[in-house]
Amino acid sequence: ARGPKKHLKRINAPKSWMLNKLGGIWATRPSQGPHKLRESLPLSVLLKERLNYALNGRDVTLILNDKEGNVFVDQKVRRDKGYPTGLMDVVRIEKTDQSFRILYDTKGRFVLKSLSKEEAKYKLLKVTAKAIGPNQIPYIVTHDSRTIRFPNPEIKIGDTLKYDLVNNKIENFAHLESGNVCYIQQGNNIGRVGIIQHIEKHQGSFDICHVKDAKGNAFATRLGNIFVLGQGKKLYIELPSGDGVRETILEERKRKFSY
């Protein structure tokens, strides 16, 4: 077996896709792109399983291969049915005039948050690397593999940028520090939202971040799992229903049977 893998069995697909186990043998394997395989949602799954715009792969191909371009990810036309969309990406469907932001719910499943035309013009980026390139040009790399040259010198690794997709400019940024609202992007607490209480430094190991949600529930996670959502309590984006507060088993049961 030389070269890259080209197939993905449905039973081995990420749980976040919520695929029907009996819906066939295969799932669309995401192409190489800005997000990792297990942290992405390919366009074909998004169109078939989430938006119900297509019944099969042929329908997906017809939608994506529209002459003028029908599906835009971060303001760019995408025609590859395996293109990996991921956290904070803005997906626009031209024919239906709809825009969505890709987020996780509190159970770690991908959800699409509907956006207005103004909200669809920007996205949030987490800074993952910072360096100085050839000719002493400073640059930063973000979680969706963007390279931005000549950033504000105050921006550090772990900070969040509010990025204008139309003009390709950084509008604003928020530091990874106590008092800011954050979103958990990985781990057991994925999808939860809360305010950073304090950060424990552990030399040679993982730094731990303590967070408290809107209901006062406290939890801790690795610092690398934190995605800052804004400065203080002011959010740069709108959250999906539930506002990132995880229900207990009893609360969920009560909600389901309260009809």
UniProtKB/Swiss-Prot annotation:
Taxonomic source organism: Tetrahymena thermophila
One GO term of the cellular component aspect? cytosolic small ribosomal subunit
Task: Fetch the InterPro entries from UniProt.
Answer: Rib_uL2_dom2 (IPR014722), Ribosomal_eS4 (IPR000876), Ribosomal_eS4_C (IPR032277), Ribosomal_eS4_central_region (IPR013845), Ribosomal_eS4_central_sf (IPR038237), Ribosomal_eS4_KOW (IPR041982), Ribosomal_eS4_N (IPR013843), Ribosomal_eS4_N_CS (IPR018199)
Which PROSITE patterns would you find in this protein's record? RIBOSOMAL_S4E
* Domain called S4 RNA-binding: residue spans: 41-105
The text of the family note is:
Belongs to the eukaryotic ribosomal protein eS4 family.
Q: Does the keyword DNA-binding apply?
A: no
Recorded GO molecular functions are: rRNA binding; structural constituent of ribosome
What name does the UniProt record give this protein? Small ribosomal subunit protein eS4
Residues annotated as carrying Phosphoserine in the record are S258
Query: Which parts of the sequence carry Phosphothreonine?
Result: T248
Q: Does the entry feature the keyword rRNA-binding, yes or no?
A: yes
- Biological process terms in GO annotation: translation
Which PANTHER family does this chain map to?
Answer: 30S/40S RIBOSOMAL PROTEIN S4, SMALL RIBOSOMAL SUBUNIT PROTEIN ES4
Where does the chain cross the membrane? none
Q: Which HAMAP family does the entry link to?
A: Ribosomal_eS4
**Keywords noted in UniProt:** Phosphoprotein, Ribonucleoprotein, Ribosomal protein, RNA-binding, rRNA-binding
